[in-house]
């Protein structure tokens, strides 16, 4: 009987269909009993004789694989494989898959929601109201600002598409990979331009990050990049936590530079 370890959380909580499918095919499965993202050591203790891991973003390292002699498949739920040692998996003929399209619509919608929240001070107003403080904040309209999108893959392109419903904001794009189909489609739009990253940092009222975590993008945004942004700009990261240096972001915001940040990843 095939044994499956489900480490990603939550899994089957909102919809039991995935678990019912496993049961239908007589698959022996274990859902993460700790109900949280596992550390490397926790995964080492748990992985045992499982054949398949349905994984989240927990680190699946050589050490983990050493303790999983039967492991044949790592099925990553979500975008990005930076948490999996792909070289080690290839050496062991372990199949690695992922679901890049599944979370893209939700993350792109969340990103636009975070923009609106930051630009309208929704969260800050809510906090102050609960403290009995009545303070009127002046917001900004999306159609009247410049938005910089770094990374125009599935999620970045989704954000771009959603923004078309908010009038015609000026949009600056940057990506390490050429997207010729998207470029040709956007050539007719005068409010959208491809630029370098520094131009995005310097000219944008909102900077939103949608790149994978790699050696090249780790700590891509540090104090230097944050300080050339507008004083009242906001930054959003819904990609990977390691892309923005969090200590630098904290220090810069404590100094009064930047008016807000929305971080969905750590």
At which residue positions do the language-model features occur?
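Rossmann-like adenosine-cofactor binding region
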Residues: 62-65, 169, 178-266
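N-terminal glycine-/charge-rich "phosphate-binding" loop or analogous flexible N-terminal tail
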Residues: 1-50, 172-174
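Hydrophobic/small residue at the entry helix of a nucleotide-binding pocket
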Residues: 155
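Structural motif corresponding to alpha-helix initiation and N-cap regions
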Residues: 15-16, 37-43, 58-62, 135, ...
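Phosphate-binding beta-alpha-beta segment of Rossmann-like dinucleotide-binding domains, i.e.
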Residues: 92-94, 99-146, 150, 158-161, ...
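Glycine-rich, N-terminal phosphate-binding loop of Rossmann-like dinucleotide-binding domains
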Residues: 8, 57, 78, 209-211, ...
């Amino acid at each position: 009987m095939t044994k499956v370890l489900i480490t990603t959380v939550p899994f089957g909580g909102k919809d039991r269909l995935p678990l019912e499918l496993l049961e239908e095919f007589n698959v022996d499965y274990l859902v993460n009993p700790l109900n949280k993202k596992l550390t490397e050591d926790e995964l080492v203790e748990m992985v045992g004789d499982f054949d398949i891991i349905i994984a989240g973003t927990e680190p699946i390292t050589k050490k983990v694989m050493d303790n999983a002699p039967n492991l044949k498949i790592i099925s990553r739920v979500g975008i990005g494989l930076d948490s999996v040692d792909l070289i080690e998996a290839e050496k062991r003929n372990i199949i690695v898959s992922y679901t890049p399209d599944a979370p893209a619509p939700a993350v792109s919608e969340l990103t636009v929601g975070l923009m609106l929240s930051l630009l309208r001070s929704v969260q800050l107003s809510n906090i102050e109201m609960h403290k009995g403080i009545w303070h009127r904040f002046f917001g900004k309209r999306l159609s009247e600002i410049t938005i910089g999108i770094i990374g125009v893959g599935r999620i970045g392109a989704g954000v771009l598409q959603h923004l078309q419903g908010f009038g015609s904001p000026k949009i600056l794009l940057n990506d390490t990979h050429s997207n010729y189909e998207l470029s040709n489609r956007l050539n007719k739009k005068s409010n959208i331009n491809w630029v370098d990253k520094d131009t995005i940092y310097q000219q944008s009222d909102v900077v939103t990050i949608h790149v994978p975590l790699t050696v090249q993008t780790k700590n891509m945004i540090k104090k230097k990049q944050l300080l050339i942004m507008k004083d009242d700009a906001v930054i959003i990261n819904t990609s990977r936590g390691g892309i923005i240096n969090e200590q630098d972001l904290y220090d810069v915001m404590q100094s009064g530079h930047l008016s807000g940040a929305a971080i969905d990843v750590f």
